[in-house]
Regions:
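Alpha/beta-hydrolase-fold enzymes
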Residues: 147-285
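Active-site nucleophile elbow and catalytic-triad environment of alpha/beta-hydrolase enzymes
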Residues: 278-282, 296-332
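Short, proline-enriched alpha-helix->beta-strand connector loops that line the catalytic pocket
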Residues: 210, 291-293, 300, 331-341, ...
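Short beta-strand/loop motif that positions the catalytic acidic residue
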Residues: 343-345
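Short beta-strand element of the alpha/beta-hydrolase
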Residues: 5-15
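Gly/Pro-rich cap/lid or specificity-loop segments adjacent to the active site
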Residues: 2, 15-127, 134, 138-168, ...
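Catalytic histidine neighborhood in serine/cysteine hydrolases
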Residues: 354-357, 361-377
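Conserved alpha/beta-hydrolase "acid-adjacent" motif
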Residues: 287, 350-356
Length: 408
């Protein structure tokens, strides 16, 4: 870790995992943002993710996920099975993004990281990035929720953050979409109040929830441009044999979007519209790598996101939500040694709108706002790699955020 201050913490999207090189591949390598010859890259699975750390699939007192294959072991939640009592299942307490931040801090302490060069992420990962310097302005704050007024001689724990396609709080619009997805899962008769057998999960509900989510990750123009009213292959509803290869390229799990459309255009079965085939294909594809309870846990976590929660005392003006937001976020830029903040906004994002990124930028003194031009909606944060790579590299180069901290 060199001088123990060249670490970059990457925070994954909701359906991602700790293998950041898998879902942000174009940002890796010499000359790119995640250059391992310069930086020590760290990524931790969020609590609730089925890929590790802690989730409804976790044994009470142990772990049930194979990090080598990223596949969940076929254990049970159901009370009629003797082994059920060993697994958290629906009994796992709800967690927040701040819980993830605190757990990640323990990992970084274990690794010996004394200062983070940057925390970056998109979507829920961007929300995590925003929480990081609020939770840990210094390495060891007096209490987890303490407001630390930085003095010039203090060393910030986080030197910079990149907030990509995220908001400072989960909006009513986003909460509503998450609730629709949860209801789709819970309406499946196999759900059994969360005490289902993993060999007989609520597949229909989870697939429907994923299809609903896909609609929020894109926007109407991109669907019309690709599908229009074309008819497509009915066998697109089945998951491909190698469904792990490209599932994490985009938040929507459809890194092979153009390839899928090309397949749909083949003059074969005409039973479905192409867009129906596309949605069913990716709904089924999601079932091979995710668990319904994990999905519900993570969506609940998203809903809890609000940087002003339990921080009313941080703001001098509590007359409105926007005033409180500004009052809390101003602490990210009110001192010479405050973390530098880059906010990236996808111009066509209908989930976390550009107005929400502008609100962050307006509230944080000396922050920088960059618009990522894209017609792909929210998924643009995992598609428009050249723009994103360039914006972050220029940001870090200007600040000289590297293994040499003397520039700051």
């Amino acid at each position: 870790i060199r001088d123990r201050d060249n670490a970059i913490l990457a925070c994954h999207p909701i359906s991602g995992n700790a293998n950041v090189e898998e879902w942000w591949t174009p940002l890796f390598g010499p000359g790119h943002v995640l250059d391992t010859s310069k930086y020590f890259i760290v990524c931790c699975n969020a609590i609730g993710s089925p890929y590790g750390t802690l989730s409804p699939l976790t044994r009470k007192g142990g772990e049930d996920v194979s990090g080598g294959t990223w596949k969940c072991s076929p254990h049970v939640h159901a009370p009629d099975e003797q082994t059920e009592q060993l697994w958290w299942g629906p009994d796992l307490p709800k967690t927040t993004i701040r819980d993830d931040v605190r757990l990640q801090k323990h990992v970084l302490d274990f690794l010996g990281v004394e200062q983070l060069a940057c925390v970056m992420g998109g979507s829920i990962g961007g929300a995590t990035s925003l929480e990081w310097p609020l939770c840990f302005p210094v390495r060891f704050p007096s209490s987890p929720d303490a407001l630390v007024t930085m003095t010039p001689e203090q060393k910030p724990y986080v030197r910079s953050i990149v907030v990509l396609a995220a908001s400072a709080r989960h909006s009513a619009w986003c909460i509503a979409w998450c609730e629709i997805q949860r209801q789709a899962i819970e309406a499946d008769t196999r759900y059994q109040h969360g005490r289902y057998l993993l060999r007989d999960p609520p597949s229909g509900g989870l697939a429907a929830a994923r299809m609903c989510a896909l609609m929020t990750y894109r926007q109407p123009h991109s669907f019309e441009r690709r599908f229009s009213r074309l008819r497509g292959k009915s066998n697109m509803t089945s998951a491909p044999k190698d469904s792990q290869a490209s599932t994490l390229m985009e938040e929507g799990g459809d890194g092979d979007f153009e390839e899928d459309v090309a397949k749909i255009r083949e003059p074969q079965a005409q039973e479905q519209y192409a867009v129906q085939s596309y949605l069913h294909h990716h709904g089924a594809k999601f079932l091979t790598r995710f668990d319904a309870l994990c999905y519900i846990h993570l969506s609940d976590k998203l809903d809890s996101h609000d940087v002003t929660r339990d921080r009313a005392s941080w703001s001098q003006d509590t007359s409105s939500e926007s005033a409180m937001l500004k009052g809390v976020l101003r602490h990210l830029g009110n001192a010479p040694n405050s973390p530098r903040v880059l906010v990236l906004s996808v111009t066509s994002d209908m989930l976390y709108t550009p107005a929400e990124q502008k609100a962050i930028h307006d509230a944080v003194p000396a922050s920088k706002l960059v618009h990522i031009e894209s017609s792909e909606g929210h998924d643009g944060f995992l598609i428009e790699y050249p723009q994103i790579d360039r914006a972050i590299r220029e940001f870090m180069e200007r600040l000289n955020v590297s293994h040499n901290p003397s520039a700051l």
